[in-house]
Regions:
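Short, small/polar residue-rich loop motifs at catalytic or cofactor-binding pockets
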Residues: 27, 50, 127-129
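Structural microenvironment flanking redox-active thiols in thiol-disulfide oxidoreductases
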Residues: 65-103, 118-120
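A short beta-strand-turn-helix
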Residues: 31-51
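Thiol-/selenol-based redox modules, centered on thioredoxin-like
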Residues: 128, 136-161
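Bacterial Sec-dependent N-terminal signal peptides
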Residues: 1-25, 161
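Short active-site neighborhood of thiol/selenol oxidoreductases, capturing the structured segment around
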Residues: 44-65, 71
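Short, internal strand/loop/helix patches
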Residues: 101-129, 133
Length: 161
């Protein structure tokens, strides 16, 4: 009986903690990233009334690379989405990722580093990459993923945005 009570209290605690995290990320974080063109970008650069997908990633993460390839392959589903890819790695790695994946061909994708500020990392409490947060056209959270979902699920949420 004690084990059951302990398990139930653990489930409730984890559930409440998770609910608090979702409530705390309802808005787009106040970030400042250095993009691949050596320009600093902030949320002020985002277009109004257009949905946003923030992806916290690492250029050398195989799951992140796979996600990028899948998004590129389904770009027709993501073309109206502003995609902001943020990392804490060195600028040279960001530049390499940008070039390797031909991101210059996709004007709706911004890739940048937050350097050692870790503001976005801490805002989302990122534990693994890629971390994805999708915001609607009013820039309010629709869905957050702690790991990459299937591209079909991601595309379906993007359509709702």
């Amino acid at each position: 009986m004690k084990k059951i009570l302990f398990f139930l209290s653990l489930v409730i605690t984890v559930g409440c903690t998770r609910a608090q995290n979702v409530a705390s990320i309802q808005n787009i974080p106040d970030y400042r990233i250095l993009d691949a063109d050596s320009v600093y970008r902030t949320p002020a650069n985002l277009k109004k009334n257009q949905p946003v997908m923030i992806v916290y990633f690492s250029p050398d993460c195989s799951h992140c690379q796979h996600l990028m390839n899948e998004i590129k392959g389904q770009m027709k589903n993501f073309s109206k989405m502003q995609i902001v890819m943020v990392s804490a790695v060195d600028y040279r790695m960001i530049k390499g990722f940008y070039k390797d994946f031909g991101i210059a061909a996709y004007p709706n994708i911004t890739v940048g580093t937050e350097g050692n500020t870790y503001k976005v990392l801490q805002y989302y409490n990122v534990k693994t990459t890629p971390y994805i947060a999708i915001y609607n056209h009013r820039h309010k959270l629709l869905k957050a993923y702690e790991k990459a979902p299937k591209i079909e699920e991601l595309a379906a949420i993007v359509k709702k945005a």
